[in-house]
Regions:
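Metal-dependent nuclease catalytic cores that hydrolyze phosphodiester bonds in DNA/RNA
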Residues: 1-104, 204, 213-220
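Short, intrinsically disordered, charge-biased short linear motifs at domain edges
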Residues: 3-6, 169-185
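Alpha-helical structural motif
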Residues: 9, 17-21, 121, 159-166, ...
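Glycine-rich, flexible loop/turn motifs
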Residues: 12, 149, 207
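Residues that form generic nucleotide/phosphate-binding pockets
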Residues: 16, 27, 162, 166-169, ...
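Cysteine-cluster motifs in flexible loop/terminal segments that predominantly coordinate metals
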Residues: 19, 178-220
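Nucleic-acid nuclease catalytic cores
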Residues: 77, 83-177, 189, 193-195
Length: 220
């Protein structure tokens, strides 16, 4: 039986949705390469996760860097922000009067995307909050630094099903120690691991010849 201490990182579902190979290189092979976008994003998350900034504004309680775990997904991680709104249908919180409805807020450096990678990470956080607080979390929000706008996300059954399916696949691949092959596409240009992944290698009819050619080019 897997211990919660050994659960995979919840943030990995965003990597997994973007590219399964990228996820494996980061979370399985422990490889990482930072570019300007990832560095700026890391600094942004450092600010979000300052737990000393927990605050209360009237009927709104803001918790930063809140640790969450989902036994159903076998994922764990930190929510950038969880907003607790005072609500008669909410849940009780230790040390707080009244009832509170949780809503996760994920912070991202760029702008809203067509794919659901960011939304799936938010959904996984919500599913973890539901397990921990025994409540229903039907919505969340993503704040995009580049546009300075929040995107409201409805946590639909379809999004939840996709999150569960991906979490299951992540755990299976991790247990096998398997790194998927590259599937080159436009998304590779935005990937910080492009030089480690070598997606161009998988587009060659003869990968061995491709490697020999580039080794010879770099030879003194």
């Amino acid at each position: 039986m897997v211990s919660p201490d050994d659960y995979l990182l919840m943030s990995g579902i965003q990597h997994f949705s973007f590219c399964r190979r990228q996820w494996a290189l980061i979370h399985l092979e422990q490889q990482w390469s930072e570019n300007q976008r990832t560095a700026e994003g890391r600094l942004q998350h450092t600010r979000c996760h300052d737990v000393t900034l927990t605050e209360k504004r009237g009927d709104l309680l803001i918790a930063r860097g809140m640790r969450v775990v989902s036994h159903r997904l076998k994922l764990t991680g930190d929510c950038d922000v969880v907003e607790f709104h005072k609500d008669p249908n909410g849940v009780s919180l230790q040390g707080r009067r009244g009832l509170w409805q949780p809503m996760p807020v994920e912070y991202k450096h760029g702008r809203s995307k067509v794919n659901d990678a960011d939304r799936l990470q938010l959904c996984a956080q919500a599913m973890a909050l539901e397990e921990m607080l025994v409540c229903e979390v039907s919505e969340g929000e993503i704040f995009y630094e580049e546009t300075r706008q929040r995107e409201h996300v409805s946590l639909t059954p379809e999004l939840r099903s996709t999150a569960q399916t991906m979490a299951d696949e992540m755990n299976r691949l991790f247990a096998r120690g398997y790194t998927p092959k590259s599937k080159p596409g436009k998304h590779c240009n935005a990937c910080s691991l492009k030089e480690l992944c070598l997606p161009a290698l998988y587009q060659q009819a003869d990968p061995a010849a491709y490697l020999r050619e580039h080794i010879e080019e770099g030879a003194p």
